[in-house]
């Protein structure tokens, strides 16, 4: 089992924690990670765009001028794609872009992402982080104590903490997630992975 240091919010190491091998020490499968990221980005798409073809644009049923004798190029409709206010060629229509990955693949991808953070020494465990007021400066102070003030960091908490979650929203490249919202895309997007000790236990309960 991999062992990682446990820090307090002052940046001092106060102990070590053993991580579950089946979650934090699995072989990295880049193909599965790629599938998970593609699915995540596809599922974020609304797919509500729509444009009209020449058949759907109002008007254009009459031939604008006779076929021959005017000296002008022949035209059949004022709603042809070459005309202003004409229809769109191969117009886009609303569609569902969502990709439903099998549960086993989703879980494996998450384990691979977490394992990659351990292997890269980018996983930081905090013993606790209690906030009872909205203080962005406090979040910046803690990140500075951990030597992460200029890093892209993902903070994972065991349950909702509105003060911490909203305080990090003002900091570019820092995001806070609950364990239930953990996803491969965010784990890979942020360089540093900060997780509270209680959140580690919760992850191991769910995915072990």
Swiss-Prot record:
Gene3D superfamilies: 3.40.1370.10. Transmembrane segments: none annotated. One of its GO terms (biological process) is translation. GO terms for molecular function: rRNA binding; structural constituent of ribosome. Residues 60-71 have a biased composition (Basic residues). Residues 58-77 are annotated as: Disordered. InterPro entries: Ribosomal_uL4 (IPR002136), Ribosomal_uL4-like (IPR013005), Ribosomal_uL4_dom_sf (IPR023574). Pfam families: Ribosomal_L4. One of the primary rRNA binding proteins, this protein initially binds near the 5'-end of the 23S rRNA. It is important during the early stages of 50S assembly. It makes multiple contacts with different domains of the 23S rRNA in the assembled 50S subunit and ribosome. Forms part of the polypeptide exit tunnel. Part of the 50S ribosomal subunit. NCBIfam families: rplD_bact. This is Large ribosomal subunit protein uL4. It comes from Caldicellulosiruptor saccharolyticus (strain ATCC 43494 / DSM 8903 / Tp8T 6331).
